[in-house]
Structures are given as structure tokens and as C-alpha cells.
Amino acid sequence: MGTIFVDNLEPQSGTSLTLGASGDTVGLASGASQTLAINTPAFKARKTSDQAITHGATAKVLYETEDLDTDSAFASSKFTVPSGKDGEYFFSWSFDIINTSNQLEAWNTYLYKNGSSVFETVWNSGNGSNVFRRINHSYSCIQDAVASDYFEIYMYYESTGSTAGNLLQANKANFFTGFKLIGA
């Protein structure tokens, strides 16, 4: 095996550059990194305080803390696609909601894009006789996005007794994440 030392490797004009052949493994040396296949921008935000959701109303979910924000693109509880980062994005969100009166009956969550719903989840206990105290669910979807598109999470909530529900900050279960898909 030999070693080639170069600063730049370019194919001939109009051709492609191939490293290895079918079945070969191309590895990076210790301490080296690749910059081609990176899932950025990426973000993860979560709640750090409870948020009341009024019965029969749709509310924007407010995320107070960012655990990850590679491109400084998450602010005011929304993710905005940075310039030059067009493509397909994977989004996921989770919520933990409680109704202390044991009257949680229905909820919808929405992924909003540029102020309008583009993805909706629906859950309804049925006829009001099957109600819950606390529910935790997670959802995900893929959305096409271009620079300056922005994404937010909204929630609609109902209870049998018209009482408010609370999105809980405990256990970091209320979060919103997203990242650009490689090759999309």
C-alpha cells in the first residue's frame, strides 16, 4: 500500500472523481472529519416552564430553552431556514399535557409553515366518556423548505369540563426538533 500526499485532488474536466471501488471501504484518519454529509442546520428546543392551553382554543407552543441550534436559526419558538439551506427537513415534536380534573378529551397538534398549518395530528377520546388525566405523544414529518420559511408548533385542546390543560416542562418531554436531510 502506498501513500499520496496532495493538497488538492480534482478530476479531469467533465468527469467525476471516484475513490475506491464497489465493496471498498474508504475511511478517515483519526482526527480527520468530513464536511459533505452533515445534517445541518439542526435544532432542539424544549419547554422550561408549564404552559396553560385554554379549552377550545389553538395556541402556539412556547419553547423557552434551546439545547441545540447549529445555525442560530431558532428564535421566538420558531425555526427559520437559513439562506442557502433549501431542502427537505425532518421535524419532530413531543408533548406532555395534563388536566388535573381528569377531563382531557381531545387535542390536535399542528406544524405551521409560514403561518399556516402544513401537518396536523388529531386525537379524540370519542364521546366524552373516555377521558384522561395526562397524555404524552410524539409526532414527526418531512417538509420541503426554502430560505426564510419558518416552522412553529401549535396545539388545540379540549376537555369535557371546559377546564384548561397544561403543557408540562417536567422530564423535558415537550420539545421541538428539526434538521436538514442529507441528499434531499
Spans of features found by a protein language model:
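The right-handed parallel beta-helix/beta-solenoid scaffold, focusing on the short coil/turn
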Residues: 2, 7, 15-17, 24, ...
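Short beta-strand/loop motifs in extracellular/secreted proteins, especially
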Residues: 105-107, 149
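Glycine-rich strand-loop-strand elements at beta-sheet edges
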Residues: 110-146
